[in-house]
């Protein structure tokens, strides 16, 4: 979100131009950390998350003791679509269909939550080893549109659900895709689940599990 409308294959050197308060707050937090590291015996790693989704791949769904997103009234696309597929929501919306993208809807880089957790560990160990502040993008360098995600959820779940076309939301960039070469080249991080089907399947399994234990 710190990149704003910057586009595809965003590197850590891409201009920062947040277009909403959330992105601006992220940028300010980064500046505070980096400024502090210049004047004190303090180093940090800043991870720029792209769109996190999915649920823990090691979940044992025979028990209620599992890891995943339990947010009420979530605003995350994959979670909302999966909630529709399992019947928790009657419908969902697509906000804008005239963006300058391949199908008119926003494009995002979705990363599985387990890979994000592993990126934290990899960057932490690299920080301990090199004792140097760094910024890393955490994504897969691949983008999927809103329409593509919704259709993939329908396909994997074998369920249809109502999708409304709504007005654009102010502050939604058309496309955000991570250039992840820096974290891949400079830390031990290696993505394990960089596949949209895998991400959505884990999210669907999670939502079905929540229905059983609510």
Show which residues each predicted segment covers:
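C-terminal substrate-binding subdomain of Rossmann-fold SDR/epimerase-dehydratase oxidoreductases
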Residues: 78-214
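Catalytic helix-loop patch of NAD(P)-dependent Rossmann-fold dehydrogenases
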Residues: 1-53, 57-76
């Amino acid at each position: 979100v710190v990149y704003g409308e910057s586009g595809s294959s965003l590197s850590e050197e891409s201009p920062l131009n947040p277009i909403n308060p959330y992105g601006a707050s992220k940028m300010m937090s980064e500046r505070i950390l980096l400024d502090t590291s210049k004047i004190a015996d303090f180093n940090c790693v800043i991870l720029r998350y792209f769109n996190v989704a999915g649920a823990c791949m090691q979940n044992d769904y025979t028990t209620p003791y599992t890891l995943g997103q339990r947010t009420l009234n979530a605003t995350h696309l994959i979670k909302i679509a999966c909630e529709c597929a399992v019947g928790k929501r009657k419908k969902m919306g697509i906000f804008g269909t005239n963006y300058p993208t391949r199908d008119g809807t926003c494009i995002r880089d979705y990363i599985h939550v387990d890979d994000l957790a592993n990126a934290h560990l990899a960057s932490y160990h690299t920080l301990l080893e090199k004792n140097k502040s760094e910024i890393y993008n955490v994504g897969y360098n691949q983008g999927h549109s809103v329409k593509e995600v919704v259709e993939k959820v329908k396909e994997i779940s074998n369920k249809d659900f109502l999708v409304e076309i709504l007005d654009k939301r102010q502050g939604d960039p058309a496309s955000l895709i991570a250039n992840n070469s820096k974290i891949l080249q400079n830390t031990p991080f290696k993505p394990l689940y960089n596949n949209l089907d895998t991400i959505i399947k884990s999210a669907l399994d999670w939502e079905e599990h929540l229905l059983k234990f609510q």
